[in-house]
From Swiss-Prot:
Binding positions for (2R,3E)-phycoerythrobilin 1 per the UniProt entry: 82
Descriptive protein name: R-phycoerythrin alpha chain
Source organism: Pyropia tenera (Nori)
GO biological process, one term: photosynthesis
Location relative to the cell: Plastid, Chloroplast thylakoid membrane
Chain sites annotated for binding (2R,3E)-phycoerythrobilin 2: 139
SUPFAM superfamilies according to UniProt: Globin-like (SSF46458)
């Protein structure tokens, strides 16, 4: 799984060298942010049901046409699948926070996602709206510390950009 540490080691190994001072500084910075990432992961895990529901609700409020006949959310079963997908991606964001890298999203969330959604007539813009809402509803210090919020928002930004 890709993280700052595994990426640094892989790059050094591929070049046949020891990690450089700047490589080690990058790893050290990643380790120093670990407490904030773990706080964000814990807060997300303990509130994930509300986060997923609010994000999904925001998506269907913004894209109400999705509930029209022939659209991605034209039955309760399809709506439930959309919420399931939002929950899946939020778990991947949580995993990214824990490992300190984008590996979980890259490996389990993005590879082929756009093609699958296009085939199933699921607009990625709706998912992007869900994750933007989840990012924007964050309130520091109500939800988490400022640094944890930076880590949380950064991972959601990565996901949003990857799906856009």
């Amino acid at each position: 799984m890709k993280s700052v540490i595994t990426t640094t080691i892989s790059a050094a190994d591929a070049a046949g060298r020891f990690p450089s001072s700047s490589d080690l500084e990058s790893v050290q910075g990643n380790i120093q942010r670990a407490a904030a990432r773990l706080e964000a992961a814990e807060k997300l895990a303990s509130n994930h049901e509300a986060v997923v529901k609010e994000a999904g609700d925001a998506c269907f409020a913004k894209y109400s046409y999705l509930k029209n006949p022939g659209e991605a959310g034209d039955s309760q079963e399809k709506v439930n699948k959309c919420y399931r997908d939002v929950d899946h991606y939020m778990r991947l964001v949580n995993y990214c926070l824990v490992v300190g890298g984008t590996g979980p999203v890259d490996e389990w969330g993005i590879a082929g996602a756009r093609e699958v959604y296009r085939t199933l007539n699921l607009p990625t813009s709706a998912y992007v709206a869900s994750f933007a809402f989840a990012r924007d509803r964050l309130c520091v210090p109500r939800d988490m510390s400022a640094q944890a919020g930076v880590e949380y928002a950064g991972n959601l930004d990565y996901l949003i950009n990857a799906l856009s």
